[in-house]
């Protein structure tokens, strides 16, 4: 048996026509071939020890081709079949150097369906770039691609069979959740929004991964082993960073690099050029990072200007952060207001020079920063050394002009008792017990002296007699 297989291998390797039709020159006619022992599938065929060469070489090359739609396990059903030497997993030819750099695009133009044993998932889905122009078939293709690409469970595509692109774009998250679980709705809706907003007509799998970065269930945390996901939305609003936890029953599967395109031309790809999951960089690193100095620079410069007053410590830090040349000692950490002192001693030294305090160090500076915690100007970032975070809302409130605190009564006339107080020169007598009601006449409020003041026992000094001419007549009109 071993000698029979060796002789069959030698015969097949000498006949190069077996390897020219499937991936060779395209001018050869495309035909189909079944295994020579297909009728005896599962049985051991009997062959003579010597295989006559003329039985193999006499066949025309155009009829000796390999049908890639065949399952290799079926072709290899007979151990003595020479076809097992020419078909390998993934559609590659053993012993043919021309198949290593095969053109994937030309192959897909000839094959409408991928072989069932393809593990690289290289079938391309081509739909219009604008989802509003999709037909019901396009919607179905998009759903089938998303289910296979991201392993979405429990997606009933039949529920979407009467939905075209326009209706799909009008659907809200609640509409998606009525047709599929919430986990799938997040992914599908996030991808659909990206397809609607992107200006590029050519979409690749990298673009899809970037689109799904905004999905809270697909943002994989670097330090949590897939248990926590990060939802950064810091492109415009610095304070919108959030952390949420996924459901434990839905494990995260890294997106595969398949080919999702919209009117795109096929790109040459092959299994040899397919990067392994260990070498694929994380999509977070591929996303273009926003420059915090461009986003926070104008705000830092405006807030760091104290005007005519003395500069405060938090304004001095913003002044350093507004210039990227100071990144050697202090730098922004993202666009949410977080910063880090890479050289805290240098920051303290510069602050000491500004305030004419040569003994300034980081310990004194950090104690001064604690004063701003209660003012909601900045906070300490826990778990990070020399890291702080500005609260721009608190700074805006702290800079609001406060009205000056006025006294309850600006003038003596505002006091309710000052009218009667000024009517009598004896200032000590207005606190006497049980003062009688003041007489009110039509001629003058202070027309006549009150008999209370002339009473020898009514005042504080009972033995003091007051003259009757004590009240001048002009006091009533003066006050």
Curated annotation (Swiss-Prot):
The family database entries (SUPFAM superfamilies) matched by this protein are listed as:
SAM/Pointed domain, Winged helix' DNA-binding domain
Query: GO biological process: any one?
Result: signal transduction
What InterPro entries does this protein map onto? Answer: Ets_dom, ETS_fam, Pointed_dom, SAM/pointed_sf, WH-like_DNA-bd_sf, WH_DNA-bd_sf
- Glycyl lysine isopeptide (Lys-Gly) (interchain with G-Cter in SUMO2) cross-link, renumbered residues: 282
- List cystine links: none
Question: Which cellular component appears as one GO term in the record?
Answer: nucleus
**What disease does the Swiss-Prot or TrEMBL record associate with this chain?**
Ewing sarcoma: A highly malignant, metastatic, primitive small round cell tumor of bone and soft tissue that affects children and adolescents. It belongs to the Ewing sarcoma family of tumors, a group of morphologically heterogeneous neoplasms that share the same cytogenetic features. They are considered neural tumors derived from cells of the neural crest. Ewing sarcoma represents the less differentiated form of the tumors.
In Swiss-Prot or TrEMBL terms, this protein is called Transcriptional regulator ERG
Species the sequence originates in: Homo sapiens
């Amino acid at each position: 048996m071993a000698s029979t297989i060796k002789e069959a291998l030698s015969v097949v390797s000498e006949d190069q026509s077996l390897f020219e039709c499937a991936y060779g020159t395209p001018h050869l006619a495309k035909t189909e071939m079944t295994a020579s022992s297909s009728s005896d599938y599962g049985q051991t065929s009997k062959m003579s020890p010597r295989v006559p060469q003329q039985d193999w070489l006499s066949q025309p090359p155009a009829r000796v081709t390999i049908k890639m739609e065949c399952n290799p396990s079926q072709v290899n059903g007979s151990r003595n079949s020479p076809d097992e030497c020419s078909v390998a997993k993934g559609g590659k030819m053993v012993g043919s150097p021309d198949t290593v750099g095969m053109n994937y695009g030309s192959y897909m133009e000839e094959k409408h369906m991928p072989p069932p044993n393809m593990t690289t998932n290289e079938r391309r889905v081509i739909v219009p770039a604008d989802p509003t122009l999709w037909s019901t078939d396009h919607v179905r293709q998009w759903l089938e691609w998303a289910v296979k690409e991201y392993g979405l469970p429990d997606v009933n595509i039949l529920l979407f069979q009467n939905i075209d692109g326009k209706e799909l774009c009008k659907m809200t998250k609640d509409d998606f959740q009525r047709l599929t679980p919430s986990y799938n709705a997040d992914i599908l809706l996030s991808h659909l929004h990206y397809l609607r907003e992107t200006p590029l007509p050519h979409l690749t799998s990298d673009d899809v991964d970037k689109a799904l970065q905004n999905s809270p269930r697909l943002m994989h945390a670097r330090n949590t082993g897939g248990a926590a996901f990060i939802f950064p939305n810091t492109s415009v609003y610095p304070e919108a960073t959030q952390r949420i936890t996924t459901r434990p029953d839905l494990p995260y599967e890294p997106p595969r690099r398949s080919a999702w395109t919209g009117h795109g031309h096929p790109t040459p790809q092959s299994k040899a050029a397919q990067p392994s999951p260990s070498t694929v960089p994380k999509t977070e690193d591929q996303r273009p990072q926003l420059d915090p100095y461009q986003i926070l620079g104008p705000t830092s410069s405006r807030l760091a200007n104290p005007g005519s007053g003395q500069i405060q410590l938090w304004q001095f830090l913003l002044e350093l952060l507004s210039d990227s040349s100071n990144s050697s000692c202090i730098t922004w950490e993202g666009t949410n207001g977080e910063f880090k002192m890479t050289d805290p001693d240098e920051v303290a030294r510069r602050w000491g020079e500004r305030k004419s305090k040569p003994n300034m160090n980081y310990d004194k500076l950090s104690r001064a920063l604690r004063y701003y915690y209660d003012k909601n100007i900045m906070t300490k970032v826990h778990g990070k050394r020399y890291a702080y975070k500005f609260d721009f809302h608190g700074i805006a409130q702290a800079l609001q002009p406060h009205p000056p605190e006025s006294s309850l009564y600006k003038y003596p006339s505002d006091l309710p008792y000052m009218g009667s107080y000024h009517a009598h020169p004896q200032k000590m007598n207005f606190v006497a017990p049980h003062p009688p009601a003041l007489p009110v006449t039509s001629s003058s409020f202070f027309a006549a002296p009150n008999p209370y003041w002339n009473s020898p026992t009514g005042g504080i000094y009972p033995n003091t007699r007051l003259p009757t001419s004590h009240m001048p007549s002009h006091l009533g009109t003066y006050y």
